[in-house]
Amino acid sequence: MSREIKVLHLESTDVCQAACPLCSRETNPDFNKDIKNHLHIDQILQHFDNDAIANLNKVFMCGNYGDPAAGKNTLDILNYFRNINPSITLGMNTNGALQSTPWWSKLGKLFNNPNDYVVFSIDGLEDTNSIYRVNVIWEKLINNAKAYINAGGSAHWDMLIYRHNQHQVNAVEKIARDMGFS
């Protein structure tokens, strides 16, 4: 009996600018932040031929050690999957404060299928997000999310609720709706 891969979770990098206190990057004493790995298309080609990619239903990037937006080749890799398989669902989880607004606009245009998405992990508002999402610059995050949404991308705001931000849930819901998060 052969088993066909339908969903692929990729780690595009182990790089992240954030220092979230419960992240594996912060809690694993064996993790070396000085080694910076980036997935390359050559590595995809070594493991997946065009037929395998054409049969995938979904590719998503949700970093265990790095933020996919920090990957030097993330956009190229996602473009490659979409070019081989135009109906594939593409997804990504991010803190949103990496890359430039033009990069996020390109991603928003690429993520044009109905089920494509980016989950922005935003834990509160400007005064509370960086309490857990250490080193995440609020203005950059919001500008990147706007660029992605304005380019047609489907965005989800994912908020971890803590004592320090629980009073902001209603405000976050309103701002998320106003910005075009789904």
Q: Where are the language model's segments positioned?
A:
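Glycine-centered loop/turn positions within well-structured domains
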Residues: 18, 127, 155
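Conserved strand-turn element in the central/C-terminal portion of the radical SAM core barrel
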Residues: 90, 145-168
